[in-house]
Amino acid sequence: MILKKISILSDNYVWVLLNTSGSCIIIDPGLSEPIIQEIERKKWRLRAILLTHNHIDHTGGTRKIIEYFPKISVFGPKETRQHGVNKIVSHGDRIILLDKIFYVFFTPGHTSGHVSYYSQPYIFCGDTLFSAGCGRVFKNKHLEMYRSIKIISSLPDSTLLCCSHEYTLSNLQFSMFILPNDNFIKLYLKKIEIKLKLGQSSLPSYIFFEKKINLFLRTNDNYVKKSIGLKSTCTDFEVFKRLRLKKDFWS
């Protein structure tokens, strides 16, 4: 299986999984034209679309893609029904595509119906967990987001994190604001600055690596707790919520 991505809008990625025979699936097509053009240019055969949630930068191209490829399956949670979904998914579902099993995880927090798709070694998690960060939390659903991130971070360390936005640099800058003396994050920040200047991507990342650079996965770290004014006895969730609120105001 080959993993590719198509850049759209200002910082979105549409992920593509492709097998050796040229059949493919795509995840969260926020636009239609660049996706259709790439599929036609590469002579791929689109089999399915997977949607993680209902925000327009993840779903905006779906209906036109369906018009162009009317036989495809479109999977998504209930909140994405208006975007042409013909197969509603929920937590615990198993989907077989391209001879691979995709497990559906309910990962709310960013939206109330957000889902993620796991097919070893890939986790397509939309706007839940980002490299060095996590998605915005709406309607004060911090506990839901915390639990969703726990689901993703509990996957094997070798799992490839395929999130939907190129936010890594900004997230690392926030991490340095919180932990200015973390040399590992400092070095990685410099590396990402160089990659982005060269027109390269920071994604995908690995779960094991995220546990080092992503403060939202370091909620039991006493250095993190101290840096945001919490006692060492506080809960991991308290750390998560404080970090997320700080990130909201920082950015």
From Swiss-Prot:
**GO MF terms on file?**
hydroxyacylglutathione hydrolase activity; metal ion binding
The catalytic activity, as recorded, is: an S-(2-hydroxyacyl)glutathione + H2O = a 2-hydroxy carboxylate + glutathione + H(+)
Instruction: Kindly state a single biological-process term from the GO annotations of this entry.
Output: methylglyoxal catabolic process to D-lactate via S-lactoyl-glutathione
**Record note on cofactor:** Binds 2 Zn(2+) ions per subunit.
Q: Where does Zn(2+) 2 bind?
A: 57-58, 127, 165
SMART domains from the UniProt entry? Lactamase_B (SM00849)
Keywords, comma-separated and alphabetical: Hydrolase, Metal-binding, Zinc
Residues at which Zn(2+) 1 binds = 53, 55, 110, 127
Highest rank taxon of the organism = Bacteria
Q: Does the keyword Hydrolase apply?
A: yes
Subunit structure of this entry? Monomer.
What function does the entry list? Answer: Thiolesterase that catalyzes the hydrolysis of S-D-lactoyl-glutathione to form glutathione and D-lactic acid.
Instruction: Give the family from UniProt.
Output: Belongs to the metallo-beta-lactamase superfamily. Glyoxalase II family.
Which NCBIfam families does the protein's record reference? GSH_gloB
Please identify the protein, giving its name as recorded: Hydroxyacylglutathione hydrolase
What is the species listed in this Swiss-Prot or TrEMBL entry? Buchnera aphidicola subsp. Acyrthosiphon pisum (strain APS)
State the taxonomy lineage.
Answer: Bacteria, Pseudomonadati, Pseudomonadota, Gammaproteobacteria, Enterobacterales
Q: Which gene encodes it?
A: gloB
